[in-house]
A protein has these predicted regions:
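Short, cationic-aromatic polyanion-contact patches
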Residues: 82-95
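Short acidic, hydrophobic short linear motifs in intrinsically disordered regions
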Residues: 29-55
Length: 95
C-alpha cells in the first residue's frame, strides 16, 4: 500500500470514529436506545452532502450508509430492523 492509499484508509478510519462519536450525541443511539435513522446520523455528524440536483437513488447518503455498514461488520454498531432501519451502539463486551 502506497502513501496515497494509506491516507485513504486513514480517512475511512477517521470517518468511522466520527460516526461512532455521533452516537454519543443523542440518547437514541446508545446501546439501549431505540436507534437513529441514517438521516439522523448524517445530520448529527455533519456528513450530509448537498447536491445541486437530487438523485433518484439518494446517492448523497451513500457515505454515511457505507460507514455504518463497516461499523456493523466491525461489531461496533447494531442495526434495528422495523419500518425503517435504525442503528445504535453495540453493548460493549466484558473481557
Amino acid at each position: 500500500m502506497d502513501d496515497f492509499q494509506k491516507r485513504g484508509q486513514a480517512l475511512i478510519d477517521e470517518l468511522k470514529e466520527h460516526v461512532l462519536m455521533t452516537f454519543s450525541r443523542d440518547p437514541r443511539g446508545s446501546n439501549n436506545g431505540p436507534g437513529l435513522a441514517t438521516i439522523d446520523i448524517e445530520r448529527l455528524s455533519g456528513l450530509g452532502i448537498q447536491l445541486d440536483r437530487a438523485s433518484e437513488r439518494k446517492q448523497e447518503h451513500w457515505i454515511t450508509w457505507t460507514i455504518l455498514q463497516r461499523l456493523i461488520a466491525d461489531g461496533l454498531v447494531m442495526p434495528i430492523y422495523s419500518d425503517k432501519t435504525r442503528y445504535r451502539r453495540r453493548q460493549p463486551t466484558s473481557a
